[in-house]
Every structure is written in structure tokens, then in C-alpha cells.
From Swiss-Prot:
Protein name, UniProt field: Translation initiation factor IF-2
Gene of this entry: infB
Segments of skewed composition (Basic and acidic residues): 49-63, 143-181, 209-260
Residue segments, region G4: 578-581
Region (Disordered): 49-85, 100-128, 143-380
Length: 969
């Protein structure tokens, strides 16, 4: 908005009005109050004065170049799965040219705004980087806490095990000591008993006996001492073995813990589990020299003979530290994970240039012995790593396996166990992929990708335009032939109903009418049952519903459906009881039926106005409009006008000359010619806008229906239309929606293939009627497809091969030839090439303009595909009077026709005592010796039955014929 006085200019400059008045007076512009008008010349004088007062000179044009550099890091995984850090540097260069013309003030303002936008973008990126860094820090903190918790639990478990082991060893030592003491005591007691016995037997032995006894006592003491020493040695040996086992277990646990830490630590920093003691620095070796056949011996090869000797305690040193020392390069700075790959990149000569790590042409005697594995011979058991896998809406099998850090074959095996055969490149839907992730023991999270549609939601919340009153959108709904369009025509003073094929509405008509009390927008919906989706769209976009009910017909099925649509949308209903000019009209009955459906008139204490009208004479039309506008006032309908437009697609079609054309209802904002619009998967610039009368218009405000041209494709009816400032952003969102829809659709189809195959196997033989449907508008095509699919039965099924909007082309005929389909054109025609191709290939093309006719003819075609029904008709009764046995012929019955007529081609049932004993065919029918075609009632004949000779006198033959009767749906 231009600033026309001092106060507005001060507000624009964000400074007090008094200060601005002082500056104006100093510049020679005489302004006394804040309401004085300002001209462009006054502003120019003020600008010159300010420049001079601040020391600005009128020199040549100058320019300033600003260069901004922003450096960041990103982590990218390569094909092997290793993460690499990549430095990203973003450089921005902007040049500002200083001009002296007053007319360039606006351009400078725009440059400042652009710079502010760049600053805001930079701040936003910095904020995102900070958030990402905080998230990474939080994840690292959680990882550290989890690792500390695991180590704490491991230490507690180890302490408990050590305490139990010490207690067990102490108990064993005590038991061994007790056993040794008991053995010594027993030996001593035995010796004493023997000595006592000897003394008792011979109290006066000689000195020789005493010497022998002393020797025996010494031997016993020696034996007791040896037993005690043996027990002590056994206890010490057991204690040493337990200590050795404990040391080995601790070493294995330390090794496993170091491996876990190395695997869980981020790749940019290699964590060393145990820091080995630094050896003394050796003297700098001389420069290694070698020839082509005998390369220089690396440092690792010098210590090879010593490495072959067994170590004193191989498990005492943790594996990662030892492996790191073994694989370390002379200038090493990288961990052992990448050393092998670096060594393999060297030129392979005939000598072992890798120091024995990788076998070259000379690997040792007969390929043995020289190679020594980097990994430790002890493989400690590690607990499985549970990963959080973010699963997008669609993901291939290979990508899913990569996210879980497993081979794709493992995923394929799991899918096979679940009963689904997949390939490595097959796309899975989100639900199936999450089941697979959970099956493999990981946590599955539904991922939210970088959805460009999120920007649309952010843009919606930021709209703060002024809300102004808008016209109401009124939808006319009701049963077919109840007079909706005729009522609307009387209001519009036009004749539309006569122009619709068959006199019924088959499109949504959108019109706006100017009444003395304001503008009203009307939506006329079809009443035929096939147009349920159209009526639902009409109720979605409306503010008030006019429910038209014929006074002579009452509440019908589509009337009930319209009531349910209005109630589902929470839309107030105004009931118009039409055709009151007819003699059989009964408005009271209509009211009672509507009360039963939950629509209570105001006179009964409800909230729905009931207005009796006549679309033929015009009676009650003014009262109807009065009630509609009264409801609109109660609703206080408002919408922003000075804002980007938003609306809904009411109808869409493909015009041969104009391309995709969409009828949309603007719900808020103002739509102008040249705006960039996005409608579902379609986008484009509005090249032309027409009102409902076909006249060009430049803009359309809230609640105004318009027809727009310039979209990239035909949008689906009911899609939301939104105006975007940038065509690039519109294209990005449209392509994102297309890819998302296509991927999800393919994944769902793939998941349903096996189930559909099993269904078809169980159903057996089912007849299919393939159809290709081309219609003039999206709504008609949708309604026709739904109506035809409802005709499917268990025996005959309608198969819609393809349905689209537009004329019938050669590609449609080619598709019909390949699928053996019938082409149905609804208000469309085939071009010359398509007609010629259809005649050459024998393709049937049917044209319709009334939906009744299309449904009826398809129903008749399906009836013709049904298997005919077989019916039996009894034509006569025959009584057996005499039986003859004829050689080489069999049994022949002499019969009398008692009722009806017997034909040679008829079937027969043999009745004995009124019980059927055989059903078959006549083999011969003779009268005297002549073969005859038929025998009438009251005549005798001879008959023989095929494959049946057990005929007795008194039997009866029931003669019948089988006829086929065509079935109907």
C-alpha cells in the first residue's frame, strides 16, 4: 500500500511521526501535522537532505560484493557400508550496486528483503545443523549410558561368580585338609593299637622287637606326613587351576567387550579397548631396498620367527590391542579395519610384498603356512545387535537388508517362510517390510521422509489475511426426477434441464446467482444412484443443502442418501417440497416421511425450514431464497480475499483443443490468471479462466466457480486446489505424489497377487467381460465404472481394463485388441484412425449419452454369457403291454401311448410301481415294422430303451424333452 500522508510514511519507516516532521521541515518541506499529504517530490527532497547531512556524495555508481562461505560435514556410506565424512562448502556471492535515482528505492528494498531472506535461510540451516548435532550427541550419550550399564551388569555378574568360586575353593580346601588329618589320625591309631597288642602279648620282648617297633612307628609317621603333603599339593594345584580359568575368562570377557566397543563406536574415532605399554623407540632403520623379484622385507616380517613360538599367556592380552599392533603401519594413523584393504591395493609381485598378511604368488610351501590370520583364534560369543530400522512407505528388498546390516538372501528366506516369493529388487510396502524387520529381531519404525507436502501445511498456518464475508455455497440434492435442475433453472432464469441427455443431470453444475440480498453459489448434483461419489463431493464443498423432495413421490433412496451426506458433513438442510402444483401432491405425507429420517421441520420444533415450491409456476421460490440467505447469515461465512486461492475440483475433463480442463470452486483467497496451481498430481499455470457462462474472467474470489485451463494432466474430482508461489515447488510436490502413489500401488498389487491366485483357483471357471471406458468428464467416468462393477456376479465378472477421460484413440483400440475388450464411449467419440483400426480388428465400440442405457446393455451382454438353464418338459406317458425278447437286439416293449406324444429323439424314464428305476434314451421307435418319428396318444408302438433290458409288463415310460432357457441377471 502506498504511503500518502506523514503518519503512514512514518509507520512505513518505523519511526515516530514527530521525528519525521522535524526532518521534513529541516529539508525544506513544510508539513504541519501527521495527516498532511506527501508527494514523491517531497520524499525525494527529504532523501537528498538526509544524504547530504550524513556526508553522502554524488559520485559515480559504486558496487559492493559480499562473499559468504559456509562449511559443513556430512556422513555418506559407500558401497561397502563404511561411513565416510565429506566436507561440504557452500559459497554465496552477492553484488549490491548503489544508485542515486529515487526510483531505485523500491529495488533497494527488494534487495534488502532478498538479503533478509538469505539470512533467514542461513539461520534456518544453522538451526537444522544444531538440531542434527544435538540429536547425534543425544544418541551418543544414550549409547554411552547403555554401554556403561552393560559393563556395570557384567562387573556385578563377574563379582558374584568370583565370590561363589572362592567359596567353593575354600570348601574344597577344608574338605581336603579334613581328609588328610583323618588319614593321619587313623594311621597313628593303628600303630598305637599294634604296639599295645604287642606289649600285651609279650611284655618282656627283647631289644630286637623294640627296634622293629620303633622302625614301624617311624614308617607310619613318614606315611602320614606324605599323605598330608599330597593333600596340600592337590589343594594348591586345584587353586592354581581355578586361578588360571578365572584369568582366561577375564581375558575373553575383556576381548569381547573391546570388540563390542569397537563395533558400537562411531566410525570417525577408533576406540582402543586396552592401551598397550609403549615400547622403546627402535633406531631408525636404513632405507629398505629390493629388486623386482625380491622385494624389500617389511617390518612385520622381521618378527615372524619369534611370532611362531607359543606365548606364555595367549589370552591375557585383549585381541583388539594385539591385532592393532600386528597390523599397524610404520606411519600408521588408521585402525586395523582398513589396513588389509590398503595392503591389497599394492602391486602384486612374485615376492610376498604384504609381509605375509596376504598371500601373493608365493604363499609358502605348496600354499601353506605363510598366511597367518589377523583375527584371534578365540571367537567370543557376542549378543545380537538390535537396530532401529526406519521403514519408508515403499522399500526394496536390497535396501531393507542394507538397513539391517544383513545379506539380502536372509530377507528373501524370511519372506519365503512367510509364504511370499520375492527378488532382491522387488519393492515391498511399508506394512510387509515392518513385519519382516520385526521377524528378524529388530525394531521397525515408520519413517517420515522429506515430504515436500509438509511445506503446504506450514504455509496454511501462516495465513493472517483479513477475513471478509463471502457468499454461501448451496448444494441442491435429492432423488432423480424430483425437479432439482428445473428448480435451479427457474432461479437462474435459464434452461439447462432440456440440454442434459435424457432430461437427467449427469454432471455437477456450478453457478452463482445474484439476488437482491446478495450472491448465492449453487451446485446441482445428479440424483441417479450411480453418482454417489459426485453427491459426496457436493456435500463436502457446501455450506447449505437444499433437499428437493417431490410432493407426489415422497422420500426415495437417493433422498435418504442425500440426508446422510448432509448430516455427515454437518451441513444445515433447507427442504424444498417441489411439484405442489400437481393434483396428487401430498406435502403432509412428505413431512411425516422426512421426520422418520431425522429431518424435523421448524413448525414441529426442529431446525430445518420446509418450503413448498413449484419449479414450473415459480411459487415459493422467493421464500426458499429467503430461508437460504437467513441460514447463511446465521453461519457468518467468512474467508480471506487478499490471499492465495484455495479450492476444490468439482469436475475435470480432457478437451481436444484446450487440453485438461478443471471446474473448481474457490473456497478462500482470490484466483487470478497466471497463478501457479497444484491439484493432486496435476500442476500448471492458469492460462485461461472461464465463468459458468463460458465468458473469460481475470480473477475469481471466494465461493465463485470457474473453469481453469493449463494443468499438466486431468486432476481427480474432489482434489484440493492450492496456489503456490513457485512452479518448481509445485512440480516437485506433484512428482512426489505421483511416485508415492505409483510405488504404493505396485507394492499393494504385488502383495495381493498370491491371494488373488488362490481365490481364482477356488472359484473355478468364471466368465469375464473386459471393458474399456472413455467418458467426457471425470465424474461420469467414475460413476459408470462403479455402476458396471456392481453388476458382477459369481459366474460373470465385469473387468475394467482401462478407464480415462477424453476421446477414443488408437491406443485404446490397440489395448482392446490385446485384451479382447469392448470399448464404451460416454459422451465421447472415436477419431478417424481409431474407427478404421477398430473395423480392421473387429473391435466393438459402443456410444452412450445416458447412463441407464450403458448399464442396461452391459447387463444384457452379461446375461448372454451366463450358462443356460436346463428344463425338462414331459411330453407323454406310455404303458408296456407286452415284452418281446429279440436276438441280437435285446428286449422290445409293445406299448400303448396313454397320454401326450412320443418322439424318436426324446428321453425316457422307466417307472415301476410309480418309482423311477432308470433314466435314459430311446433306442428305437417302431409302428408295426416301420421306424417312425413320433407316435400320438391312443396308438400302439414298439420301443426299446438304450442300455436297459429289464422291462416287465405293466411298467410305464415317462417321455420328456430337455430344453435350454436363457438366464438373466
Amino acid at each position: 500500500m502506498a504511503s500518502n500522508n506523514v503518519a503512514q510514511f512514518a509507520a512505513e519507516l518505523k519511526m515516530p511521526a514527530g521525528v519525521l516532521l522535524e526532518q521534513l521541515q529541516a529539508a525544506g518541506v513544510q508539513k504541519a501535522s501527521e495527516d498532511d499529504a506527501l508527494s514523491e517530490a517531497d520524499k525525494a527532497r527529504l532523501l537528498d537532505h538526509l544524504r547530504k547531512s550524513h556526508g553522502a556524495t554524488d559520485g559515480d555508481k559504486r558496487k559492493i560484493t559480499l562473499t559468504r562461505k559456509h562449511t559443513s560435514e556430512i556422513k555418506q556410506s559407500d558401497a561397502t557400508g563404511k561411513a565416510r565424512t565429506i566436507q561440504v562448502e557452500v559459497r554465496k556471492k552477492r553484488t549490491f550496486v548503489k544508485r542515486d535515482d529515487v526510483s531505485d528505492v523500491a529495488e533497494q528494498g527488494q534487495a534488502q528483503v532478498a538479503e533478509a531472506d538469505d539470512d533467514a535461510e542461513l539461520k534456518r540451516r544453522e538451526e537444522e545443523a544444531r538440531r542434527e548435532a544435538a540429536l547425534l550427541e543425544k544418541q551418543a550419550q544414550e549409547l554411552r549410558e547403555r554401554q556403561e550399564r552393560l559393563e556395570r551388569e557384567e562387573a556385578e555378574r563377574r563379582a558374584r561368580e568370583e565370590a561363589a568360586e572362592a567359596e567353593r575353593r575354600r570348601a574344597e580346601e577344608e574338605a581336603a585338609a579334613k581328609r588328610a588329618a583323618a588319614e593321619a589320625a587313623a594311621a597313628q591309631q593303628a600303630a598305637q593299637q599294634a604296639a599295645a597288642a604287642q606289649q600285651a602279648a609279650a611284655p618282656a620282648d627283647s631289644a630286637q622287637d623294640e627296634a622293629r617297633a620303633a622302625a614301624e612307628r617311624a614308617a607310619q609317621r613318614e606315611a602320614a606326613k606324605k599323605a598330608e603333603d599330597a593333600a596340600r599339593e592337590a589343594a594348591e594345584k586345584a587353586r592354581a587351576e581355578q586361578e588360571e580359568i578365572r584369568k582366561r575368562r577375564e581375558a575373553a570377557e575383556a576381548e569381547a567387550r573391546a570388540i563390542r566397543e569397537m563395533m558400537n563406536t562411531p566410525r570417525k574415532a577408533v576406540v582402543k579397548a586396552v592401551e598397550p605399554p609403549k615400547p622403546a623407540e627402535p633406531a631408525k632403520p636404513a632405507e629398505a631396498k629390493g629388486t623386482l623379484h625380491k622385494p624389500a622385507k617389511p617390518e612385520g616380517a622381521q618378527a615372524r620367527p619369534a611370532a611362531k613360538k607359543p606365548a606364555a599367556a595367549p589370552a591375557a592380552t585383549p585381541a583388539p590391542a594385539g591385532a592393532g599392533d600386528r597390523n599397524k603401519k610404520p606411519g600408521g594413523g588408521k585402525g586395523g579395519w582398513q589396513d588389509d584393504a590398503a595392503k591389497r591395493r599394492g602391486i602384486k609381485t612374485r615376492g610376498d610384498s604384504s609381509g605375509g598378511v596376504d598371500r601373493g604368488w608365493r604363499g609358502g610351501p605348496k600354499g601353506r603356512g605363510r598366511h597367518q590370520d589377523n583375527a584371534s583364534s578365540f571367537q567370543a560369543p557376542t549378543e545380537p545387535i538390535v537396530r532401529e530400522v526406519h521403514v519408508p512407505e515403499t522399500i526394496s528388498v536390497a535396501d531393507l537388508a542394507h538397513k539391517m546390516a544383513i545379506k539380502a538372501s536372509e530377507v528373501i528366506k524370511v519372506m519365503m517362510k512367510m509364504g511370499q516369493m520375492v527378488t532382491i529388487n522387488q519393492v515391498l510396502d511399508q506394512e510387509t517390510a515392518m513385519i519382516v524387520v520385526e521377524e528378524l529381531g529388530h525394531r521397525a519404525l515408520a519413517a517420515k521422509l522429506d515430504d515436500p507436502e509438509a511445506l503446504l501445511v506450514e504455509g496454511e498456518t501462516g495465513s493472517d489475511a483479513e477475513q471478509l464475508p463471502r457468499p454461501p455455497v448451496v448444494t441442491v440434492m435429492g432423488h432423480v426426477d424430483h425437479g432439482k435442475t428445473s428448480l435451479l433453472d427457474y432461479i437462474r432464469r435459464a434452461k439447462v434441464a432440456a440440454g442434459e441427455a435424457g432430461g437427467i443431470t449427469q454432471h455437477i453444475g456450478a453457478y452463482h446467482v445474484e439476488t437482491p440480498r446478495g450472491v448465492v453459489t449453487f451446485l446441482d448434483t445428479p440424483g441417479h444412484e450411480a453418482f454417489t461419489a459426485m453427491r459426496a463431493r457436493g456435500a463436502k464443498a457446501t455450506d447449505i443443502v437444499i433437499l428437493v423432495v417431490a410432493a407426489d413421490d415422497g422420500v426415495m433412496p437417493q433422498t435418504k442418501e442425500a440426508i446422510s451426506h448432509a448430516k455427515a458433513g454437518g451441513v444445515p438442510i433447507v427442504v424444498a417440497i417441489n411439484k405442489i402444483d400437481k393434483p396428487e401432491a401430498n406435502p403432509d405425507r412428505v413431512k411425516q416421511e422426512l421426520v422418520a429420517e431425522g429431518v424435523v421441520p421448524e413448525e414441529y420444533g426442529g431446525d430445518s425450514p420446509f418450503v413448498p415450491v413449484s419449479a414450473k409456476t415459480g411459487a415459493g421460490i422467493d421464500d426458499l431464497l429467503e430461508n437460504v440467505l437467513l441460514q447463511a447469515e446465521v453461519l457468518e461465512l467468512k474467508a480471506p480475499v487478499e490471499a492465495p486461492a484455495k479450492g476444490i475440483v468439482i469436475e475435470a475433463k480432457l478437451d481436444k483443443g484446450k487440453g485438461p480442463v478443471a471446474t473448481m470452486l474457490v473456497q478462500s483467497g482470490t484466483l487470478s490468471r497466471g497463478d501457479i496451481v497444484l491439484a493432486g498430481t496435476a500442476y500448471g499455470r492458469v492460462r485461461a479462466m472461464l465463468d459458468e457462462n463460458g465468458k473469460p474472467t481475470k480473477e475469481a474470489g471466494p465461493s465463485i466457480p470457474v473453469e481453469i485451463q493449463g494443468l499438466s494432466e486431468v486432476p481427480a474430482a474432489g482434489e484440493e486446489v492450492i496456489v503456490l508461489p513457485d512452479e518448481r515447488k509445485a512440480r516437485e510436490i506433484a512428482l512426489f505424489r505421483q511416485g508415492k502413489f505409483r510405488d504404493v500401488k505396485l507394492a499393494k498389487q504385488q502383495a495381493a497377487k498370491l491371494e488373488s491366485m488362490l481365490e481364482q483357483m477356488g472359484e473355478g471357471e468364471v466368465q469375464n467381460l473386459p471393458l474399456i471406458i472413455k467418458a467426457d468428464v471425470q465424474g461420469s467416468q467414475e460413476a459408470l465404472v462403479q455402476s458396471l462393477l456392481k453388476l458382477s456376479t459369481d459366474e460373470v465378472r465385469v473387468q475394467i481394463v482401462h478407464s480415462a477421460v477424453g476421446g477414443i484413440s488408437e491406443s485404446d483400440v490397440n489395448l482392446a485388441t490385446a485384451s479382447k475388450a469392448v470399448i464404451i464411449g460416454f459422451n465421447t467419440r472415436a477419431d478417424a484412425q481409431a474407427r478404421k483400426l477398430a473395423e480392421a480388428n473387429g473391435i466393438d465400440i459402443r456410444y452412450y449419452n445416458i447412463i441407464y442405457d450403458a448399464v442396461d446393455e452391459v447387463k444384457a451382454a452379461m446375461s448372454g454369457m451366463l450358462a443356460p438353464e436346463k428344463r425338462e418338459v414331459v411330453t407323454g406317458m406310455v404303458e408296456v403291454r407286452q415284452v418281446f425278447k429279440v436276438p441280437k437286439v435285446g428286449t422290445v416293449a409293445g406299448c400303448m401311448v396313454t397320454d401326450g406324444i412320443v418322439k424318436r429323439s426324446s428321453s425316457v424314464r422307466v417307472l415301476r410301481n410309480n418309482v423311477v428305476i432308470f433314466t435314459g434314451e430311446l433306442e428305437s421307435l417302431k409302428r408295426f415294422k416301420d421306424d417312425v418319428k413320433e407316435v400320438k396318444q391312443g396308438f400302439e408302438c414298439g420301443m426299446s430303451v438304450k442300455n436297459f433290458n429289464d422291462i416287465l409288463e405293466g411298467d410305464q415310460f415317462e417321455v420328456f424333452e430337455v430344453t435350454e432357457v436363457a438366464r438373466t441377471l
